[in-house]
Amino acid sequence: CSSDLNPKIESVREGVKLCKENSIDMVLAIGGGSVIDCAKVVAAGACYDGDPWDLVITPRWIKKALPIYSVLTLSATGSEMDKFAVISDMSKNEKWGTASDHMKPKMSILDPEYTYSVSKKQTAAGTADIISHICENYFTNVKNADVQARFAEGLLKNCFKYGPVALEEPDNYDARANLMWTASMAINGMIQYGAEVAWCVHPMEHELSAFYDITHGEGLAILTPHWMEFALNDDTAYKFADYARNVWDVVNDDDMAAAKEGIACTREYFKKMGLPQT
């Protein structure tokens, strides 16, 4: 299954047509999240009589799907280990997420060496996507879910440590391996148990890329620090302070001041990774 920068419904329709005309009995996705997302909806669309766009905007209509297998070549979306897919219809400037247990890959091959050739741009954008997935699950109003919080903080520290290494040493196995496994852990459900997850930043980025077809991770890197500043207030300062102290090793007893330092560290990190700021 081949796909675009942001997987398009036209690619899905083409894939569904091929499956139906050739009695295909499984779908193999070789690539990153865009390819895997496309493959998931192709697999579901092959078992549906209508337009596959119906399954994007109405996930409950997904009743079955062809078996899906993936070979991951880009660490970012975590699509290799979850039930989600995001598809765009540029003719309508719409980008929607869909989900179904039927679309979970039956098997995914994760070999870090397959990511050695990923460009600096995509490595940086992919790392930003991983970070955003973790933050979406981490910044919630649920208190005392310490196992999930510490797990999320560990995953974030992994991104902040190994992202720059992968940029400078693209064939560094440890960096690529840690980013690859972190991407899968970030969105497979492990860190959201017991949390009330709102998913604030991703929907905003979907609107941006629906109109401008920008790289998803770059859009997230632009939006994330701004969202953090918007969400920071007296009621949320404690959580952003935890983030600053436990992830960025900020030493400041004042929650609000510590929180602002953590946000500044995040913005500076994205800048050093070569990601756009506006």
Predicted regions and their residues:
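Short, small-residue-biased leader/transition segments that mark boundaries at the very start
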Residues: 1-2
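Short Gly/Thr/Asp-enriched flexible loops that form oxyanion-binding sites at enzyme active sites
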Residues: 13-16, 35-49, 81-82
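Glycine/serine-rich anion-binding loops at beta->alpha junctions
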Residues: 24-40, 73-79, 211-214
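Short glycine-rich or small-residue beta-strand-to-loop segments that form or flank ligand, phosphate
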Residues: 27-30, 69, 186-187
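A glycine/threonine-rich phosphate-anchoring loop and its flanking beta-alpha core
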Residues: 47-150, 238, 242
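Active-site segments that bind and position negatively charged phosphate/pyrophosphate groups
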Residues: 137, 141-265
